Amino acid sequence: MLFRSRAPQWTGGGVVFAPVPRDYEVKMNKKERRAALKSALTSKVQENKLVVVDSLALAEAKTKEMQKVLTNLKADKALVVTADDDQKVVLSARNIADVQTATVNTINVYDVMKHNTVVVTKDAVASIEEVYA
């Protein structure tokens, strides 16, 4: 046999530098994560980009109603934070471009900094203060 069929230069041969699955995850301490989120929220407050609302009690789960609420708040690219998983808010906001919903337990620094405005309910503010204060 003059050649090896598994050599990379032959049809059906191997790949020279094949992609290798890599884990790009970086461990971050709890205190660092909390401090980063505190800093991000403080930054939004200083820029007047954090809006506190009494509640987001929508009559129905309609995108149009959520759009009206966000237009009145002048929040075009917004992160809507609620205390618990409010299905009406989630269903109303999911079809609006550049609007994302989150609960107090699921917010992160990336989402806070990515959005221009952060809309938070009073219950969510109380929960955030309880956890991060």
Language model region names:
Residues 10-11, 15-16:
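Active-site metal-coordination/substrate-binding segment of hydrolases
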Residues 1-2:
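Short, small-residue-biased leader/transition segments that mark boundaries at the very start
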Residues 18-133:
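Extended polybasic, low-complexity segments that bind anionic RNA or targeting/receptor surfaces
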